[in-house]
Each structure stands twice: as structure tokens, then as C-alpha cells.
Amino acid sequence: MQLSEKELSSINDLLSEEELLTKKFKMLAEQATDTELKDKFTNISERHQQHFNSLYKLLG
């Protein structure tokens, strides 16, 4: 599947956002002292990593 320049640009923007969110929630999980909160932040970080991986696969 051939992607247009606009599509590639959008995917790259989304990759940057997902990478930032993954790092942000991972950092919050590391800093959290409450176990439940730490688990939630970790799960959110993992979900954003999955989104990143899915988007990255589109680039081939």
C-alpha cells in the first residue's frame, strides 16, 4: 500500500505523540508511590506503546 505524503506526515506526527505519551506515563509510573496508580500508569504507557507499534507497522 502506497501512502501519500500527507498520510506519512500524519503517521509521523502520531508516532511522535505516542512516543511522548509512552515516556510520560512510564515516568509517572516510576514516580508513583500508590500501587494502584502505578499500575494504571503502567497500563496506559503499555497501551500507547502498542499504538506506536501499530502505527510503525504502517510504514512498512
Residue ranges and their predicted role:
Residues 1-60:
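His/Met- and acidic-residue-enriched segments that coordinate or traffic transition-metal cofactors
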